[in-house]
Amino acid sequence: MLEKFCNSTFWNSSFLDSPEADLPLCFEQTVLVWIPLGYLWLLAPWQLLHVYKSRTKRSSTTKLYLAKQVFVGFLLILAAIELALVLTEDSGQATVPAVRYTNPSLYLGTWLLVLLIQYSRQWCVQKNSWFLSLFWILSILCGTFQFQTLIRTLLQGDNSNLAYSCLFFISYGFQILILIFSAFSENNESSNNPSSIASFLSSITYSWYDSIILKGYKRPLTLEDVWEVDEEMKTKTLVSKFETHMKRELQKARRALQRRQEKSSQQNSGARLPGLNKNQSQSQDALVLEDVEKKKKKSGTKKDVPKSWLMKALFKTFYMVLLKSFLLKLVNDIFTFVSPQLLKLLISFASDRDTYLWIGYLCAILLFTAALIQSFCLQCYFQLCFKLGVKVRTAIMASVYKKALTLSNLARKEYTVGETVNLMSVDAQKLMDVTNFMHMLWSSVLQIVLSIFFLWRELGPSVLAGVGVMVLVIPINAILSTKSKTIQVKNMKNKDKRLKIMNEILSGIKILKYFAWEPSFRDQVQNLRKKELKNLLAFSQLQCVVIFVFQLTPVLVSVVTFSVYVLVDSNNILDAQKAFTSITLFNILRFPLSMLPMMISSMLQASVSTERLEKYLGGDDLDTSAIRHDCNFDKAMQFSEASFTWEHDSEATVRDVNLDIMAGQLVAVIGPVGSGKSSLISAMLGEMENVHGHITIKGTTAYVPQQSWIQNGTIKDNILFGTEFNEKRYQQVLEACALLPDLEMLPGGDLAEIGEKGINLSGGQKQRISLARATYQNLDIYLLDDPLSAVDAHVGKHIFNKVLGPNGLLKGKTRLLVTHSMHFLPQVDEIVVLGNGTIVEKGSYSALLAKKGEFAKNLKTFLRHTGPEEEATVHDGSEEEDDDYGLISSVEEIPEDAASITMRRENSFRRTLSRSSRSNGRHLKSLRNSLKTRNVNSLKEDEELVKGQKLIKKEFIETGKVKFSIYLEYLQAIGLFSIFFIILAFVMNSVAFIGSNLWLSAWTSDSKIFNSTDYPASQRDMRVGVYGALGLAQGIFVFIAHFWSAFGFVHASNILHKQLLNNILRAPMRFFDTTPTGRIVNRFAGDISTVDDTLPQSLRSWITCFLGIISTLVMICMATPVFTIIVIPLGIIYVSVQMFYVSTSRQLRRLDSVTRSPIYSHFSETVSGLPVIRAFEHQQRFLKHNEVRIDTNQKCVFSWITSNRWLAIRLELVGNLTVFFSALMMVIYRDTLSGDTVGFVLSNALNITQTLNWLVRMTSEIETNIVAVERITEYTKVENEAPWVTDKRPPPDWPSKGKIQFNNYQVRYRPELDLVLRGITCDIGSMEKIGVVGRTGAGKSSLTNCLFRILEAAGGQIIIDGVDIASIGLHDLREKLTIIPQDPILFSGSLRMNLDPFNNYSDEEIWKALELAHLKSFVASLQLGLSHEVTEAGGNLSIGQRQLLCLGRALLRKSKILVLDEATAAVDLETDNLIQTTIQNEFAHCTVITIAHRLHTIMDSDKVMVLDNGKIIECGSPEELLQIPGPFYFMAKEAGIENVNSTKF
């Protein structure tokens, strides 16, 4: 039929059976024309429908678009001309075949359709159509056959169809031009990402990414260089899609759970399921409280959670991406098995000299084409999968964050902040990782089945022997993996312990330096590190066995298979076709067999993460239904029979509260510890579980928590808290909250970076910023949970007057104030006394006193136990009937000019205190003006900060290539001798690899010499034996290389860790002041972990890949020396691609790390401050911040993923060209090459693509991971403090007297800063008791630090008992002094270790010290006594007990000099008295220097030293100084000590 249609032969095999084969013209004009046209017409409706549904606006007409339309217009004209020519010919005598009418007519319709599609896509602002690009490629490929046929015809002198041929050539040229234009992208200024407008060819080759690669090569990339992600990748878009499915699937899972529970309940004879309450949502069963074990014992059951819904939700969200990637992977897998078949044809071609040459060329072209299609499909598949992984991670991270904002307290109690952060980081990452390779599950099975099928065709049943070996290896690997996992778990525990100690060391480094305890703690860390390295070595040695088995498996498989094949039947002779085709198939089989168990393991790990995420995301939300907001309510707040609890099964914490609070009232809530004061506020915020009753609130709420929550940012940002800046209001708030003097001190003022959790601020400063934040918001109701607890009494008074009180900024607002301060109660409108969660009393101050109930009783007790500062203000009511009056006056009476006192006490105590009111007024005015200027010119101010004024130094991030010296340093740590033997073993492995391939080639050549009947058994056995021996040699040399390297790498890890630890412990204190602890811990955690695990693996892989590529190229060049000419340009391309990629990839990895940390920090910060965020209703703002952070990280991750694809496609092209040119050489030189040589060369060439790719990745990995060594080295070069011990040592009994002399002593914190002590000169006699006082920043603590040489002298000297302390070792000095610091820092370990880490004292001495420290009875009551374990930072002891333990340390050391650095500032009155009494008795014969916080603690001193601005401005006995109206006199007066002359303490 088609022959009539064409009027010529449609098909005849004889056309191909000739040296110059060709296809029949009819076939070319029908089938090869209709294939591309059919593709276009079939898919065009779908394409146009997609365009029709698109809502994108029309774009402007571009030159590129016009050019393509014009060229298609020319094609249309050419088709019309051809049709006209046909009609002209047909009018003559000759009969024109139907095909000559049909084709131009079809083309006319097709070009019109193309014009329509191009126009519609331009109208929709779509990128160039991949659909049209594929059509042009298909049309050009199909047209190639007709093109060469017409050329041949013309060359043969047949010009009968000259006009038609010319039209075809012109049309063909225009199609090529259109395809070239299609490779370019339309300019679209609205797009932030070129990938969204990239053409089809640009997309599959990733050439749109060239500009980033070029930029990254020229200079280090910055965040601004990296493009934003598409809208479809944005967090907001992904979460919106995912949440829709998540809610639906979660509801289904909850209903299914409810049905199961109901069914179970019915089966249990209607027994009620514990934990299930009709008033609760079913997801409540997902909750497990902290005391779950106790409740399990009670109920004997475990609560269920909705399960198996997360994966369904993810699948429904991203199923289209999964479908696309599935199709691409399927095509890739099919084409994987094309290469071995083409290899077989090429070997056959080389073996048979009679085969036509064109068959060889066709096979070479098909081999290249198959490899190219495989590469494009594989890289597109990976791009889709990795993008999907990022999308899944983003959706999970954003959902976990959003859930954290709504999760109930009951559900939240299960998770620490760290565990919740882990859900975002670790669990989301595991789901991302498994998503990247999830198709490998079915793909591995498919590849295994197809491999065995094709192997069976080559070798028959013999293949089962090889497969059997592979199957046997799987359980061996499983056993080895299990053992490896056990070692890893053990090692992780050791690592956790080491990092825990390191964290404690760094947190308490000052204590370690004060007590010279560094060696003891260094030894603890080193001992744990030894265990860690021992496990690491054991793990590495086990990995050597794993690698040995892995290396030996393919050799063993091929040896066993080939041996069985030649042994089972004497007719079976191994020829080149069978051997090398089988080797290629075995190489394909290796990958899925190794990947399948890994994938199953990864899936199991991911399932654990899925369960954890399901439990968290399926947890109950906060139920705020009991909190009713009514804007028309007549009261500000009303509690109606309100009872609330923290846990469902526990008793109510707030019970049956009935309370009305009117608008504008100031209500104080008081009561003993545990009475429910904070719980009352939490109930109002909706943070507790409602038992019954409700709370009605009118208006918006602000909340100041007891433990202040500060964000990592500037002070100004913390106060504004996302609201608009109002200069006037802002200044009022700063002054009212007593923050102006603090801002004067802080570098940068209100623009000062205050660090994570307000690390650079005192507790009082943090509390005042927290209060300022609430005050600035100007809301209706203020819930204040003991905001004055962390501030000085006088600062508290100032804040009460200026902010909280009747005349404060918040007057007219409704205020609920929880407080322990009795002084302010007379000024409140109403007092609510709580006891055991209920209201015991309520009423006005005078009314409650008149009742003489619980409140009046507590007030009397308070006044009896108040310190001297308060006692001095008590009205002397001697008569019984004056009791109530005395109570009132004693609380109401306050010192004059509270604002002045506050400012002087906190920051601005000047020598001219006699003119305090006037001077302070002027000072505050100037300070306000300066702050106003600072706010207006904030940017300028920030830029002009004095050098050295930054509190925390920004972490230095290396850019560009890592210096060679870093590599050299690491190699020296491994050991040059070890490196030599490691490389030698790897080289010998490569030699054995080349030898085994050459031997196999020789073995297959036997088939030409011998036939099946006369093949000698001895020859056969020798071939099998030597081949097996060479394979075994490969395994042995790899084992030796890995085994030796294990020792070398562990040795390097040990050296680097030891250097880092020693140097950090010897670093001066200023290093720790300017470097966040987390940054140092990261060196001991992340960087050491990289040096332990990742870097060694990368180095081994790099050496293996490098030698593998060299081996392959050597073998190819040995077979065909002319191939060397091809290797050189390919090598240049390869090296160039590598250089460009590594520079970019390295910086993108750094950017990924830099942008990932803020996500987790922000999340951790959010979880810590949830009640505040929810109270201010700022959830949406924080969600937006989270989205911005995730998107910032996403663009770095996406860019890094794309850089990998950019690299892979180019390397695979180099690899494919290597295979193509190898095949081409085999065809060209087939007369000089045998089939076994061809098989030998091509089977190795087929492996080179993957190895080339892996080598560049390993190069990049090494460059990325060597940064860890760079970072460690940076800290090993930190300047050290003075030597611990020197040759000049003091006498053993030094100091015997305790006499201290300061001679013009000067000191500064850092070289670039001003002096903090300016010429201190004084003599402290033996056994003198010295009190040191002064304002904040006067230099009191600096004086202490100088004694211990924490700060080194900038001038002058300190002499103790005749010895200049600068002339002796630090430990010789510090071991002879004792300090009781302000913060009682303990370390995890036994009580004994905390008292005596060096075991220098006997048990009797320690018990004696504990007795004197008033701790003996407490320690004796403990089950383990001195061995009792102290938790991290002493968390299981009270602050008082911790401070008494510090006293115990001091008592043990029996030093002649004792320093008390505000040691009782943070303890209660009882503990304070205990410490003071013990010091007076036990250190009577010592020199005692007390840095005073409470003046009464130094009133019995021999001398008082008053410091200001780093100088001694007064010095003398307390009695003398109180006679003179000087600084000390005014300080005593401010403290409320009125009768200064007669006061005796």
From Swiss-Prot:
It holds the Pfam family ABC_tran. It catalyses: ATP + H2O + xenobioticSide 1 = ADP + phosphate + xenobioticSide 2; an S-substituted glutathione(in) + ATP + H2O = an S-substituted glutathione(out) + ADP + phosphate + H(+); taurolithocholate 3-sulfate(in) + ATP + H2O = taurolithocholate 3-sulfate(out) + ADP + phosphate + H(+); leukotriene C4(in) + ATP + H2O = leukotriene C4(out) + ADP + phosphate + H(+). Residues 322-605, 979-1264 form the ABC transmembrane type-1 domain. It is found in: Apical cell membrane. The modification Phosphoserine is found at residues 281, 283, 878, 926, 930, 938, 1438. Residues 637-861, 1300-1534 form the ABC transporter domain. ATP 2 binds at residues 1334-1341. Its EC number is 7.6.2.-, 7.6.2.2, 7.6.2.3. This is ATP-binding cassette sub-family C member 2. It comes from Homo sapiens (Human). The gene is ABCC2.
